[in-house]
Amino acid sequence: SSVYSNTIYYLTKIPNLKIHDLNSSNGIKYLKAEKSFKVGIVENNVQCNKPSENDIKNKFKIIKKNLERYEKVFLEKINLKYVVLCENLKVADIKTAGVPNHKVKTLIIDIKSDPRYFERSIHHELFHMADDSYDNLFSYDKWEKFNILDFQYAECSTCSNRSDLSLIKDSNGFITEYSMSTASEDMAEVFSFMMTDMDNLSIISQDDSILNNKINFIVSEIQKIDNNFKFK
């Protein structure tokens, strides 16, 4: 009803949404685009299209299963309450798997993003909410000191051509090519593997002290937010 959509708009600042599912164990409210929406300022606008019911049916179980791993207490601390399902998500005309906005407690997920990395991308975007919610944690300066001396990240995640999301077995401090783009993306990539592929990550990091330091850093910072947090 229009009352609901007005309330949803008031809370999330996104138009054209309706409720999809309110029965989560951790308080997340799942919303979906009823028609396409476009929000934000011109050079940084976010746009996304209405998803088909079939696509939602295929992906919703996966999204919910992954997000149900987070306790309500933790989600409240990182300001995540609303998850918006849509497809063909873009920021400033660049395709993206998700858009987190901790100020309105909302994570937008493109349910049609690359299925190979879909589950991992959920945790990747959730990490950005944690990072954005805590200015005093996840120091980029500390993180950059883990890398070899002459390594430099790009100015921003979209101003580099380091975009491959597949696992680098011979890691040398970086788990994917995309993790070489910025410190923030590097952290989110490591966190996403910690949540979805810890077995592989543990094997790789045995021979990679840089990666091992990065994993330990993420554990210690996440535990400062919630010391009961479980990665498994």
What kind of region is each of these model predictions?
Residues N79-K232:
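Active-site-flanking segments in enzyme catalytic domains
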